[in-house]
Amino acid sequence: NWACVYCQVENLTRGGPPPIDLDMLERELEGFLEEALHGDFMRRDVPPEARRLMDVAFSGNGEPTSAPEFADAVACLSAVLERFNQKGKLMVRLITNGSLMHRPEVQLGIERLAELGGEVWFKIDRAEAAAVVEINGVPGQPEKMAKNLKICATWAPTWVQTCWFALDGVAPSATSRSAYCNLLRPLAGELAGVHLYGLA
């Protein structure tokens, strides 16, 4: 539902996602964990220094919370992690633009994620309406972003994820930096922190 200028997803289209086949999701999660934990996948395909599972992330080609099955998918993951004795051991993350946090079904998914010891990475690249349009390709609503961020932080540990870069050779202005800090400042005590990164 966003179209960020730095997005690398090919043929990105707006609109809702296809339905999630929860039975298939469960089979695929079980199959992968079986191979990764008990099979030869790590030895066969992963360099020795990287042979560990880091997380299970809800992210990718679009906004994960836009799937009506999001909360059920988190519950499915919880059951699979329990069977593999990975609950509380393998980090669970949601990487989101936060635009749908007002929906009760999304909040249920966030609550379930928190019960797994998971966390949310909540995207805020800019905090001025015009800059949000320019960078994220959606109407800029800083007040709504702040409200949704607060909702998210109420349900689960929440990191703000920010991509900061020059556009056409022009770095974000002092006004833009101040707007960003002013948006986050009232919530600083409720957030896990900020992941600040640039373009590779």
PLM regions and their residue ranges:
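Residues immediately within or flanking Cys/His clusters that coordinate Zn2+
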Residues: N1
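Conserved AdoMet/S-adenosylmethionine-binding subsite of the radical SAM
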Residues: S66-L199
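Short cysteine clusters
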Residues: C4-C7
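Conserved Radical SAM active-site core
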Residues: V9-L116
